[in-house]
Structures are given as structure tokens and as C-alpha cells.
Swiss-Prot record:
Keyword Ubl conjugation tagged: yes
Protein name listed in UniProt: Breast cancer metastasis-suppressor 1
Higher taxonomy: Eukaryota, Metazoa, Chordata, Craniata, Vertebrata
Modification after translation (UniProt): Ubiquitinated by a cullin-RING-based BCR (BTB-CUL3-RBX1) E3 ubiquitin-protein ligase complex containing SPOP, leading to proteasomal degradation.
Pfam family, one: Sds3
Tissue localization of expression: Expression levels are higher in term placentas than in early placentas. Low levels of expression observed in normal pregnancies and in molar pregnancies.
Annotated region described as Disordered, given as residue ranges: 1-57
Signal peptide: none
Length: 246
């Protein structure tokens, strides 16, 4: 059999195999180079990281100090501003110009006016009550005075009438006793001239109709008893009047 020449496909496959082997070798070399460069870069980066860390730390510390200084300055400035504002508001309050003072003050003044009006109305009512009470007390006092005056007048009138009655009774008793004594004396003096009088001028004995009481007492005793009875009646009559009264 004749020998056939190799086909193009086989040649291409061999060429691809050679190129793949070459590429694998190159890749291995590149990986070794990269690993070496990485180690070198890591060493360099570690040295750079320490320096960068120190540099950044110093920068951060300086920035922090700067910020603290700015904060303290701002705080002091804010304190001064707030203090000046408070002083200004205090001056406005002292001059009665601050709104936070004038608005409540207006409310207080309005409430003061209302309370003054209410107090005036209450005062008027209280004065009316006191005036009415005074008039009632005055009227009651006048009525009490009038009643006491009438009672005193009645009492004095009764006492005076009793005294007058007693005086009248005493006067009558004295008149009777004096008449009796006069009659006695006249009877003793004129007993002798009785017979000498004419019959026309002699007193006739009184005619008594009905029962005739013969007193066994003497005339002086009868007169004393009659006077005692009159005085007893006069003493009993005011007591009876007081018991019958209101």
C-alpha cells in the first residue's frame, strides 16, 4: 500500500499542541513572576502602611485638636451671644417692652379689670344687704321702743291709778273717821240741846225696809274693819289685773 501523506488536520492538531505547551510554560513563568512581585509589593506595602498610618494618625490628631479648638471657640461665642440676648431681654422686660412680658401683663390687667368689676358688684350687694339689715334692726328697735314705752306707760298709769285709788280710799277713810269723830263730838255736845230743839227741827230716824242688821260692835271698830277691807281689796286688784293681762 502506498504511504499517504499526513493530512492537514493532524498537522494543525500537532501545531495546536505545541502552542498549548508553550503557552502553559509561559503561564507558569508569569505566575512565578507575579508571585515574586507580589511578595516584593507586600513588603513595600507593609513599610508604606506603617508610614502612612503614622502620617494619618498625626493628621487625625491635629484635625481633632483643631476641631476641639473650633468647638470651644464656637461654644464660647454661643455663650456670649446667648448671654447678650438674655441681657437684652432682661432690659426689655425691665422697660416693659418684651412680648413675653407684655402679653401676660395684658391678660393680668384684663383679669384685674374683671375682678374689680365683680368686686364692685359684690360690694353693692353687700351694702344693700347691710342697709336692709340696718333698716330692719332700726325698725325693730323702734317697734321695741314703742312697745316698751306703751308697757311702761300702762304700768306707770296702773301704779298711779292704784296710788290715786289708795289715796282716795285713805282720804275717804280719814274723812269718815273725821266725820265720825265730829259726829261723836257733836253728839256729845248737842245731846243736851236735843230736848231744847223743837220737834220740827229734830232729825227723824231713818226708815229701813227689808232686813235690818244689828251690829254688836262699836262704831269705831266697824270703821276700822271697813278701812281694812278697802285696803285689802285695793292690794288684791293690781295682782288680779297682772294675772289677767298678756
Amino acid at each position: 500500500m502506498p504511504v499517504q501523506p499526513p493530512s492537514k488536520d493532524t498537522e494543525e492538531m500537532e501545531a495546536e499542541g505545541d502552542s498549548a505547551a508553550e503557552m502553559n510554560g509561559e503561564e507558569e513563568e508569569s505566575e512565578e513572576e507575579r508571585s515574586g512581585s507580589q511578595t516584593e509589593s507586600e513588603e513595600e506595602s507593609s513599610e508604606m502602611d506603617d508610614e502612612d498610618y503614622e502620617r494619618r494618625r498625626s493628621e487625625c490628631v491635629s484635625e481633632m485638636l483643631d476641631l476641639e479648638k473650633q468647638f470651644s471657640e464656637l461654644k464660647e461665642k454661643l455663650f456670649r451671644e446667648r448671654l447678650s440676648q438674655l441681657r437684652l431681654r432682661l432690659e426689655e422686660v425691665g422697660a416693659e417692652r418684651a412680648p413675653e412680658y407684655t402679653e401676660p401683663l395684658g391678660g393680668l390687667q384684663r383679669s384685674l379689670k374683671i375682678r374689680i368689676q365683680v368686686a364692685g358688684i359684690y360690694k353693692g350687694f353687700c351694702l344693700d344687704v347691710i342697709r336692709n339689715k340696718y333698716e330692719c334692726e332700726l325698725q325693730g328697735a323702734k317697734q321695741h321702743l314703742e312697745s316698751e314705752k306703751l308697757l311702761l306707760y300702762d304700768t306707770l298709769q296702773g301704779e298711779l291709778q292704784e296710788r290715786i285709788q289708795r289715796l282716795e280710799e285713805d282720804r275717804q277713810s280719814l274723812d269718815l273717821s273725821s266725820e265720825w269723830w265730829d259726829d261723836k263730838l257733836h253728839a256729845r255736845g248737842s245731846s243736851r240741846s236735843w230736848d231744847s230743839l223743837p220737834p220740827s227741827k229734830r232729825k227723824k230716824a231713818p226708815l229701813v225696809s227689808g232686813p235690818y242688821i244689828v251690829y254688836m260692835l262699836q262704831e269705831i271698830d266697824i270703821l276700822e274693819d271697813w278701812t281694812a277691807i278697802k285696803k285689802a281689796r285695793a292690794a288684791v286688784s293690781p295682782q288680779k289685773r297682772k294675772s289677767d293681762g298678756p
